[in-house]
Design a protein with these regions (language model features):
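Short, hydrophobic transmembrane alpha-helix segments
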Residues: 37-49
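The first (N-terminal) embedded transmembrane alpha-helix
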Residues: 24-34
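Alpha-helical transmembrane segments and adjacent TM-loop junctions that form the membrane-embedded core
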Residues: 2-12, 16-19, 23, 46-48, ...
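Membrane-embedded alpha-helices of multi-pass membrane proteins, especially ion channels
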Residues: 35-38, 138-139
Length: 297
């Protein structure tokens, strides 16, 4: 039987996801170059903010693509748990990039409010409309893959790019109707707030995994109850639960069981491991046993 940790690469449908990442990168990068050029020509901060976000998305797609490649490598003597956390690190880096981008949008928008600049509303609206179609198409590619944290960070990137394009379209229309360029900055600030909130959630979740916190969705006390549900288990301590990747959780603990022979103790451990997989979604368990007769009086 294969050791699951030694085959972490089997977790992802790599071929399909790799193709999605490649397609998304080419389409997004092409549109980003076009949007930057029009943003500079039109003087629109909303377009430049959206183009900057698109640029970060291209970088994000590239990071995730290579993280995916690394994560598929089999475990070895130096990396016994495999390389699954490469994807978590990718999510963390992507989240930080987005946080910094949101802060930069605030800085530029406030500067434009203090010192307004001419904005060509019709160009802004036209490019933004194309951006909505491009970003929505790419976001939909990853909609069903969000259970992977690194893909969720990519989906958030693309979703907010689509939202930013909607904002840029609205800004362009308002500028055409009112001749007031302040709408460009105000909508940029709103986009920045929404982006900051979502990107910080990705950073927080990735940091939690990297610091080996108990994975979200798993209650350590309930896991302990699952172990103690075996009538022969008398005590559980030194319980550790952590995520190796978005989809792979590990556990180690020490249990005290009633005095029994080696064969019976192995059956107890196998049963506990099976229950942990079924009830708590914990794939890899290391359980140290101690017999009651070994305990000091």
């Amino acid at each position: 039987m294969k050791d699951k940790i030694g085959y972490m690469g089997d977790i992802w449908n790599s071929s399909s996801l790799d193709n999605k990442l490649k397609f998304g990168f080419v389409l997004n990068t092409g549109f980003t170059i076009f949007e930057f050029a029009v943003g500079i020509f039109s003087g629109s901060l909303a377009l430049l903010s959206d183009a900057g976000h698109n640029l970060s998305d291209s970088l994000s797609l590239l990071i995730v693509f290579f993280a995916q490649k690394i994560a598929k490598q089999e475990a070895n003597i130096d990396h016994s748990y495999g390389y699954g956390r490469a994807t978590i690190l990718a999510a963390f880096v992507n989240g930080l990039i987005l946080v910094l981008l949101a802060l930069y949008i605030f800085y530029e928008a406030l500067g434009r409010i203090i010192q307004p600049e001419h904005v060509a509303g019709s160009l802004v609206a036209g490019v933004a409309f194309v951006g909505i179609m491009v970003n929505t198409s790419i976001a939909l590619l990853f909609r069903k893959d969000q259970d992977n944290m690194h893909i969720r960070s990519t989906y958030i990137n693309m979703f907010f790019d689509a939202l930013a394009s909607v904002g840029a379209l609205l800004a362009g229309l308002l500028i055409i109707l009112t001749k007031q360029t302040i709408f460009d900055s105000l909508i940029s600030i709103l986009i920045g707030i929404l982006l900051l909130r979502s990107s910080w959630e990705v950073v927080r979740d990735a940091m939690h995994v990297l610091l080996e916190g108990v994975p979200s969705g798993i209650d350590a006390e309930k896991v302990k109850e699952v172990i103690l549900s075996n009538s022969l288990v008398k005590h559980v301590d030194d319980l550790h639960i952590w995520a190796i990747s978005s989809r792979y959780t590990a556990l180690s603990c020490h249990i005290v069981i009633e005095d029994c022979d080696v064969e019976e103790s192995e059956k107890i451990i196998d049963k506990i491991k099976e229950e942990l997989r079924e009830k708590s979604n914990i794939e890899h368990s290391t359980i140290e046993i101690e017999l009651t007769e070994c305990l000091p009086d």
